[in-house]
Amino acid sequence: MTEFVGTGQFVQLSAHSLEQLSKGVLGAINCNDAIATFVARHLVQANLMGIDSHGVVRLPQYVEQVEADYFSPAGTPVVTRCDRGATVINGGRGFGMPAMQLAVETGIAQAKANGVAALGVTNCGHTGRLGAFCETGARNHCLTVILGGGARRDWRQVAPFGGSKGMLPTNPYSFGIPGGERGSVILDFATSVGAAGWIYAAKSAGASLPEDMIIDRNGHPSQDPQDYIDGGALLPAGGAKGYGLALLAEIVGEAMLGRVTTDMNWIMIVIDLERFQGVNQFSASAEAILAEMRECPPADGFSAVEIPGEREKATAKQRQRDGIPIPQQSWEQITAVAARLGVPVTT
């Protein structure tokens, strides 16, 4: 999902100007320069790829969470345990993006040494776009899997299949694997019909939601983002299938990794593909599989069969050239936060 229904005016901005503004806002809430730079770049990259729900629209939310002491912008991740391929990383109550970056870098090194690595990531704030970390694994010829859960006490966002109120978080999954000549194949999805971030982004943009995405607090279907905010719930993706995936992630997040202290807990699995097939043989086989998919005649209403991750790459090229569209209402909220923090805004 990359568009909202009924969105109004947009402001077109360069990636550089958005990154500088984001870095300024993050610095103003006590991020050190390295963390501010990394998180700002991560957010803008999400916007470039068309994943606007995980882009700069998150800045007001992050500021609000820091001011409420939900997480610490100065927190830094550390490896607290490493035992025979099983590693635990404590995010230090900081932003989740640096914790995930430490996890994937550690996981790649361990997978290259041992074939496989499993890493738990705990005690950190929002982790951003999970696909970014799976891309890092894929570039290093690894299969990377990430899933998160355990936060249902704080985030009862998704109704279980057959239920009428929110009981589970959106418990996202991401997978990344090399894909041949055109780059990696990346899957990154919430176990709900859409990510909760899309709802807040839609509200910020003054937009309505697609049908069959949320229910209101009484269990009735709705397209109004406010109905979700006022106690409604997202629906599980694919009905029982999305519910089952979410429930599994919830058990992993808490029963396996311990009670959540900040946001949610994560498990990352990294596998060195060279332990199974050489790089050239793998790439040729993957390319042949993807070529078969692309040759499939498109159904009515579609121009072509796409490979997961390719649309985002194309969007990034276009937005790098033409600028990133930010809904006017979202931009006003971001600039209001920046002004309150004394951060200059340039476009």
Task: Identify the residue ranges that each predicted region occupies.
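Phosphate/diphosphate-binding glycine-rich loops and adjacent basic-rich segments that engage nucleotide
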Residues: 153-223
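A generic, well-ordered mixed alpha/beta core segment in the N-terminal half of proteins
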Residues: 86-180
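Catalytic-core signal marking the mid-to-C-terminal active-site face
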Residues: 2-21, 256, 260-347
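Active-site cofactor/substrate anionic-group-binding motifs, chiefly glycine-
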Residues: 54-108
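Solvent-exposed alpha-helices and their adjacent loops that cap or buttress functional pockets
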Residues: 79-82, 111-113, 138, 165-169, ...
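Small-residue-enriched flexible segments
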Residues: 195-253, 257
